[in-house]
């Protein structure tokens, strides 16, 4: 539920994905 300051509209979460973030509603979120 916490925004990870990375979008995933065109490409998946990259750097923030390593921190455990995942794509939701075009934005990378962590819980």
From Swiss-Prot:
PTM description: Contains 3 disulfide bonds. This is a cyclic peptide.
Expression across tissues: Expressed in root, seed and nodule but not in flower, stem, shoot, leaf and pod.
Superkingdom to which the source organism belongs: Eukaryota
Disulfide bond positions: 4-21, 8-23, 13-28
Crosslinked positions (Cyclopeptide (Gly-Asn)): 1-31
One BP term from GO: defense response
Stated family: Belongs to the cyclotide family. Bracelet subfamily.
Protein name: Cyclotide cter-D
